[in-house]
């Protein structure tokens, strides 16, 4: 996996040793692999199960298993900085938008407008577009980035406002 903004040079600037919580994609992937029964803990070590060993070298099968675990089994709300619930949020619809509309670079506000009914968001922290963007960041774009299914525009970095980021399918 290649995770944007999680390159070794950047991570080791502040720490000489990294733990999973210092590296969110790894921490979540570890949890997903435990939940999907691809890893187990024994004597303080994470070891692959039979199913996990069977997936070694089969990137497509591993990606599909982690995708299912993330979008069907994991409580993504636990990883949100500002938990937001939208009654009309539908992950199947979100994934359809990604499949059909992210062939070229799409700015986050446009993606948010396609995924969520922005005009129906009446209670918000910053603005309807900002709240929808944060919601999609934790529930859709970040997981798909970590799974390698979409990419963030190369000119965007950690300091780029979420509303100014652009994404496309890989």
Residue ranges of each PLM-predicted region?
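Conserved aromatic-histidine-acidic binding/catalytic patches
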Residues: 14-25, 44, 58, 83-86, ...
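Intrinsically disordered or highly flexible coil/loop and linker segments, enriched in small
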Residues: 39, 104-111, 149-153
């Amino acid at each position: 996996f290649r995770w944007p903004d999680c390159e070794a040079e950047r991570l080791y600037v502040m720490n000489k040793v990294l733990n999973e919580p210092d590296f969110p994609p790894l921490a979540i992937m570890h949890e997903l692999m435990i939940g999907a029964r691809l890893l187990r803990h024994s004597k303080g070590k994470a070891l692959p199960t039979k199913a996990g060993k069977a997936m070694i070298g089969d990137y497509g099968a591993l990606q599909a298993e982690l995708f299912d675990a993330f979008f069907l089994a994991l409580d993504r709300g636990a990883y949100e900085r500002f938990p937001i619930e939208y009654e009309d949020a539908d992950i199947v619809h979100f994934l359809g938008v990604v499949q059909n509309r992210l062939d070229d670079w799409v700015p986050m506000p446009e993606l948010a407008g396609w995924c969520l009914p922005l005009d129906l968001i009446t209670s918000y922290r910053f603005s309807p577009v900002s709240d929808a963007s944060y919601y999609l960041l934790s529930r859709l774009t970040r997981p798909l980035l970590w799974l390698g299914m979409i990419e963030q525009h190369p000119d965007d970095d950690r300091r780029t406002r979420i509303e100014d980021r652009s994404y496309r399918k890989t």
